[in-house]
A protein has these predicted regions:
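Short beta-alpha connecting loops at secondary-structure transitions
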Residues: 19, 73, 103-107, 135-139, ...
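Active-site cavity-forming subdomains of large catalytic enzyme subunits
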Residues: 1-93, 97-108, 131-135, 188-190
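Short acidic (Asp/Glu) and glycine-rich catalytic loops that position anionic groups and cofactors
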Residues: 12-17, 85-101, 129-133, 150-169, ...
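Generic beta-strand/beta-sheet core signal
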Residues: 50-53, 69, 89-91, 151, ...
Length: 277
């Protein structure tokens, strides 16, 4: 995948390899393929891109002695070893603001409390979960991976009046995720003091990283698509922009006209809202 992304940056062709022999068997234009991937993902949600090389770097696979990551969780957000599974959960960022109007800002204190509670919740869920196979129970109990994600990021930007495709939005995303990662690790360290580190800790790369990484869970965060749970929480999905200001959602029995509440709020503030619109 790294070779493809470098080719895409250069807008050049990339090689196709025979999986059996490893020999080059053709080439394709990287930009044409990437544009097609983006178009089809927008139309129906597939395909996604799996970075096989990144899946097995030090951060993604802290237990290389136990094997390589060869699969993912159902939505592709989490690299996993053979037979492994992971408990996922997401924080609704749009509920972590303080102030009003132009004085609104991210409430990091509240976000920190939520992250600590969420890590404990996900570790509890790992403990109570049932497993269909012995191999799955052993590897999950051994690594205790959890995936704390986010949703409502686009909603957060709406309320802060920050354009989604701006450098300011990217900087805020980086600041938020760095904070979540830091607090998630702190919470996992607290759990390790109470309940012990994960069973495979001594086989992991974290063992030699010092006290900061003496944690309950081998891995902590993810970026899940949250397509379904964001509907339940009435917020924008994951880190994605909204699908549309207004659209028709169809189910097996009903059709729903959905209008983005933040657009409606601005329309009323600026006095251009109407039912006909």
């Amino acid at each position: 995948t790294t070779e493809f992304m470098h080719a895409l940056k250069r807008r050049s062709d990339y090689n196709l390899y025979d999986p059996r022999t490893g020999e080059v068997c053709g080439t394709l234009n990287s930009k044409r393929i990437f544009d097609l991937i983006g178009l089809m993902a927008w139309k129906n949600g597939d395909p996604g891109i799996v970075f096989l090389d990144r899946m097995n770097n030090e951060r993604s696979n802290p237990t290389p002695n136990l094997g390589v990551c060869e699969t993912t969780s159902p939505c592709g957000e989490y690299p996993l070893l053979a037979y492994e599974s992971v408990i996922l959960g997401s924080v609704n960022l749009s509920k972590h603001l303080k102030g009003e109007g132009s004085a609104r800002e991210v409430d990091f204190e509240k976000l920190g409390r939520t992250v600590h509670l969420a890590v404990r919740f996900l570790d509890d869920a790992t403990e109570l979960n049932g497993f269909p196979l012995r191999q799955t129970r052993e590897i999950v109990s051994g690594n205790r991976k959890i995936g704390l994600s986010i949703m409502g990021f686009a909603d957060l930007l709406f309320m802060l009046r920050i354009p989604y495709n701006s450098r300011k939005a990217l900087n805020l995303a980086e600041k938020i995720m760095e904070y979540i990662q830091t607090e998630a690790r702190a919470s996992s360290r607290e759990l390790a003091k109470e309940r012990g580190v994960f069973l495979n800790f001594d086989e992991s790369l974290l063992k030699d990283k010092g006290a900061e990484y003496k944690q309950r869970n081998a891995t902590l965060t993810a970026i899940s698509p949250t397509g379904t749970i964001s509907l339940v929480a009435s917020c924008s999905p994951s880190i994605e922009p909204i699908y549309g200001i207004s659209f028709l959602r169809k189910t097996a029995r009903f059709e729903f006209l959905e209008v983005n509440p933040y657009f409606e709020e601005v329309a009323k503030e600026q006095v251009f809202y109407s039912e006909e619109m």
